[in-house]
């Protein structure tokens, strides 16, 4: 119970997990077991099966040495079966590169096919005032379609949708951009700053980035291209997802334009999203690790705020400390 309490209160960030000593009775039972089999005890497998090493040793108390060895054999079998098998597993997902429509999902409509118009943001309502009139857009803002529109309109902020939800275990996040457009809009004076963002900033809706709903990998690459396109005009990209795998292409795109290590990231999340042992490289639990590993953001310029719940555990906090990353648990936030 104390371990769970420490985690829920955020105290695991400040204390190392105590190592459970191996009981002498267990040492006696394994003294004749081959060393290569005992290596499984150093893996996460015992804790995965029984929660803690203390519980594991407790479960072994009534077993004979032969039964203990059989239990270790079972854990080894599970560990081996969990690994990649080149004889039975696919290392990559095959694609039909002969398909004439391979890139049709992200092929742009040539401007020559559109009615000729002067570049710049397009207002989609016929009315001067009122909210929720005309076609729904982010923040009730005018629409921009091409980079030329951003440049001609001297746009400060381009809000763009990224309806991707395949980097998560659950579906539905792809409806985020649609839901945000259906909200009342944005406007009025913020009471904390006495500033009306819609008046002091030129804001546009830049549409949704195309997503291949059959491939997270292809989609994320295209998101990176489109976010980079916005940033190259000098406009600030404001991305509405979508699941959290999108953090990686968003951050990488800014590094493409401004240079690796030239900016920082403030990451508000209950989890640190720096997992590194999962089968898929592009998920909602790994964008921070990839952004740091590939050098897009220096770890000391990554700030985590709001960490709570069961993840990260001791290894995650150790990784952040070793890399100089700053973090603030939700317990700290509530105190302040």
Task: Tell me what each language-model feature is.
Residues 11-15:
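Sec/Tat signal peptide C-region and signal peptidase I cleavage site
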Residues 17-159, 164-336:
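Conserved alpha-helical scaffold segments that buttress catalytic/binding sites
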Residues 2-10:
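Bacterial N-terminal signal peptides
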